[in-house]
Regions:
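A glycine-rich, coil/turn loop motif that links secondary-structure elements
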Residues: 182-188, 237-240
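Extracellular/oxidizing-compartment recognition motifs
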Residues: 1-182, 191, 208-209, 228-233, ...
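Carboxylate/His-rich catalytic cores and anion/metal-binding grooves
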Residues: 73-82, 148, 190-215, 268-280
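Generic anion/oxyanion-binding catalytic loop in active/binding sites
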Residues: 111, 154, 185, 199, ...
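Helix-terminus loop motifs that line ligand-binding clefts
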Residues: 86-95, 207-284
Length: 284
């Protein structure tokens, strides 16, 4: 910045913004935790300096890569994918990426500690030789709640469906609420919550998590009673009335599953405010 460059900008009059009142509440549920450790099961060359590592299945978590000595200033790219069609040709480089920059003196460890990833395939681009499988570790991350139910029968297809549902839901519950997807938006959509709550609350003891999630909905309720489609609500997201009504349906379901009526007692006024708002927008 300099006087010359600032004078050349197109300055406009100041706009006064009105900031609505918002509550700031603590996270009242278990923290995230790394629950296990996994290494890739195979590696394949995908170009002169690219290698794709297969984790064997999709995971959501922290990735740690032990890097060799890399030329000073050279950038090593890490790309993530949950699937590809064939021959690695449709691997979406740059869609979801991290970068490691070498110092030319010693190796280092890349860690996605502050940005978990959801993927099965990891492409590392910029190295002349593949890393040992043990150099790459994926540690699944989930909210550290307790299990609530198990299922097993003589039908292997039903067992597979149960295991898929169990692992999917566990992978989606991060940071005190359930996300729509762990690799893109990571938003707590009310529509997704309504569809998943009966199963999620049956498989796991997530009563504290729902106390936290419903609190987030109350925190971001607007002054006129309107509700967003996601909570927490960092930016606008799509949905409809079914999304906004999550506070009502989830509180009721929490009482049915756990006998815990605190959500209905605590947030009944918020529910009434939203219903009044919704009714004000209805015609006939």
């Amino acid at each position: 910045l300099s006087t010359e460059t600032l004078d050349g900008l197109d300055w406009r009059p100041v706009t006064v913004a009105r900031i609505p009142d918002h509550a700031a509440s603590p996270q009242m549920c278990e923290l995230n935790a790394k629950v296990s450790r996994h290494h890739p099961v195979s590696v394949h060359r995908a170009g002169d300096d690219s290698f794709i590592y297969d984790m064997g299945r999709n995971f959501v978590g922290q990735t740690d890569v032990v890097m060799p000595v890399v030329e000073d200033g050279k950038k090593i790219a890490l790309y993530y994918e949950d699937y590809y069609l064939k021959d690695y040709a449709d691997f979406r480089d740059g869609e979801y990426s991290d970068y490691y920059v070498g110092n030319g003196k010693s190796g280092g460890v890349f860690s996605s500690k502050f940005n978990y990833k959801g993927y099965r395939y990891l492409k590392i681009k910029g190295l002349e030789a593949p890393l040992a499988l043990e150099s790459i570790t994926l540690s699944p991350v989930m909210t550290d709640f307790e299990g609530g139910a198990d299922f097993e029968c003589s039908d292997e297809d039903l067992n597979a469906i149960y295991n898929m549902s169990h692992e999917t839901l566990a992978s989606l519950v991060l940071g005190g609420y359930m996300v729509d997807c762990p690799q893109i938006e990571r938003l707590g959509y009310g529509g997704d919550g309504n569809a998943s709550t009966p199963v999620l609350q049956t498989l796991f003891n997530v009563s504290p998590l729902y106390m936290n999630w419903i609190q987030a909905w109350a925190d971001c309720q607007r002054e006129n009673g309107d509700m967003p489609h996601t909570a927490p609500n960092p930016y606008s997201a799509g949905g409809g009335p079914f999304w906004c009504a999550f506070m009502i349906a989830a509180s009721w379901q929490t009482w049915l599953n756990y006998g815990d009526e605190r959500l209905m007692e605590r947030y009944y006024p918020n529910m009434c405010r939203w219903l009044d708002y919704a009714e004000s927008k209805c015609v006939d």
